[in-house]
Amino acid sequence: MVKVKQSEINIGMVGHVDHGKTSLTRQLTGTWTDTHSEELKRGISIRLGYADCEIMKCPKCGAPEAYSVSKTCPVCGTKTKMSRKISFVDAPGHETLMATMLSGASLMNGAILVIAATEKCPQPQTKEHLMALDALGIENIIIVQNKIDLVDEERAKESYNEIKEFVKDTVAEKAPIIPISAHHGANIDILLNAIEDLMPTPEMDEGAPARLYVARSFDINKPGCEISKLKGGVIGGSIIQGTLNSGEKIEIKPGLKIVEGNKIRWESIITKITSLGVGGKTVKVAHPGGLVGIGTELDPALTKSDSLSGCVAGAPGTLPETLSEITVQTKLLDRIVGSDEELIISPLKSNEALMLNVGTATTVGIITSARGDMADMKLKLPICADKGDRIAMSRRIGSRWRLIGYGIIQ
């Protein structure tokens, strides 16, 4: 079996719709990650796009020209060496897909905020995505000023000043602003250099019991497949600690919904790992970082159409409890961003329904009691989470869910 290098860090590609996130991901990875949106019965679910990128460095040239994604140096033609392998999570920029962006953010160790120079900054989702990074505690940020090939020098400078003004007093205040053209590949070397300098590989605890956030799940069998050739269901996600080995057993929580009369309970699923896939290659052991596909012995009917996304998987008996009620310490934003008018955020009140994102899970919490900055909530769909985990909270305003702050599970 070939030794496959796994991605060491997950970087989110965030920003307003049509500002060039997917084009930039394609320029860096060669993969068009466009995501299919489909509204599933558990609220809105649109797939995140994922792609791996190998950052290559020329041993002869100096930085930033030394960095590229090519096997030979574009400047001098020397054979390049791999500096690091990284994974991009391409989050949707459309306002209705905020829930997906938030569930993708739990997989991100850093983010590239893409802002087009062709439009006034900030656009609604540019603001909302930056607030989300802040709420979820993502501090390693690089700002990319895209589409500089479509504006003159005067507008490029004006756009730069708008961005500077916009990020003042936010988590991205000190982030570098790199002007690029994703379409023509201009300044990609400078961006890669910045990623290497400013986004260190996070320290993951490989000795801890394995834990993985499930972001996707599917049935890989084609219709009409012979029974003897059927393959078990596949789950995909990111390992946040520990390692997974082919042949091991894993537990998936909250797992299966079981209805008995008028009672509903959730039962965790235990299955065996039949295969592990990383970057399109099969491996025996999967480590934290990047995205891992896990073949299992599960009935594919249980995994089709992302039905297990939002679950947590790991070594049996080591996962947190499945919670259907939680107490959170909340921190609300000052105002709602992402829409044309910015409304002041009123305090939480009893019986209010909030959309909650924790890990890759999305659920609705009904507030049973709100006092000061503490709130008790009953969850429509249970979650598997630990004390101290961060939850992004959104409130329904008009026909949209809008981010209003975050909470820490008590």
UniProtKB/Swiss-Prot annotation:
Pfam family, one: eIF2_C
Region listing for G4, in residue ranges: 146-149
Residues that bind Zn(2+): 58, 61, 73, 76
Residue ranges of the region described as G2: 43-47
UniProt binding sites for GTP: 18-23, 146-149, 181-183
EC number: 3.6.5.3
Protein name: Translation initiation factor 2 subunit gamma
Annotated organism of origin: Methanococcus aeolicus (strain ATCC BAA-1280 / DSM 17508 / OCM 812 / Nankai-3)
Gene name as annotated: eif2g
